[in-house]
Amino acid sequence: MATSKFERLGGPGKFGAWVRYGGKPITQQQLDFAVKNYSVAILQPWELEAARYLKKHAPQMVVLAYKCLSSTRSYEPGPIYSSGLSFAQAVSLANSGKDFFAHRLNGDRIEWKGYSKHYQMQVWNPGYRWYWVDSVVREMRDSPFDGVMGDNDVENDYYGLNLPIQGVPSMTTIREGLDRLVASAGAELNGIGKILVPNIAESRLRWGKWERHSAYGGGFEEVWLGWGPNDYLASPYAVMQGRDIARGSGGDVSLGVYLTGLKRGASTQKKVTILRTPLSDRKSPLTGTDENFLYGLAGFWVFGGGAFTGISATHHDAYDEIPHAPELTFDLGDAAGGIVVQGTVQTRTFTRGWAALNTGSKDVTVKVPSNLVDAANRPVPSSFTLRAHQGV
């Protein structure tokens, strides 16, 4: 546990996140790099030996198993799957009269647009939710993983469902089903000492969603401050996203209820907050770090105040990389005050540094505290111009 008053998870001085959705087998070099540089890792659930290695050599690292909340995939050989309900099990249940596949109005199963062999499941069906929770909890009970990252906690139709479909007149039905699945899975996982960290899509659009869905371990924002290399959230929405996640990231999670004498109690830990921002392929002239990575990292510090767990930057769906930047080793310490707003620029002072980001579309000249140096150890002027969607 870190010594910061925020009690950050992941270990002191480590702020990187390893978000791995598959790809080539993990190498020993990648594992050793992760031990030195990452506060949190999301691995495929069958990568058990990698999880054991990370927990042995970096016990403070949060290591999560990927599980999709909304789909099953027909291409996975097993015996461990990235879904709560394997394709073969779902087919077997359907043949026995318990069909949990989603269907179009004509009766066809729904394969996700852009993701072949991914099939939408009936998240609104209590039966599907029961099988999902039962399967995942049994798998996690004696697992080296700290818990589960629940992917596709969706807010809108991202995969060509083209509503209405059978049993689903609108996205409200799907959202409500996911609300219930997250609550049920989270409570059951917490009961065995594990956490649930959903990939909470567009929480800024529904007041309180981040708080509710992160209540069982934390949350993951996959589109931090933007969707693509040049596709950013407009300034009001970027600020709303940052403040919404910061507000919802506080508080403790109760794990593994136990008995002490005649009293019932549980251990607690802080929530995990993971961010991922899209790479831009534009490099900082000072350190060579991707400009969007720096923008996201500045937001990580400004909005998180030193309490967020880890951040990553990748290309779209490029989740077999080991992203890193020199700036991820900069520990700014604890927040020395709140967020200071200068137009579309958000700044914050820390006990060992300062961070700022411009969420707007125009350049802004910002005032800088005295006695600061940059990454090259050069004195920082009292003011400078922060470009649109730039962070320092």
What are these regions (language model features)?
Residues M1-V392:
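Glycan-processing catalytic domains of CAZymes
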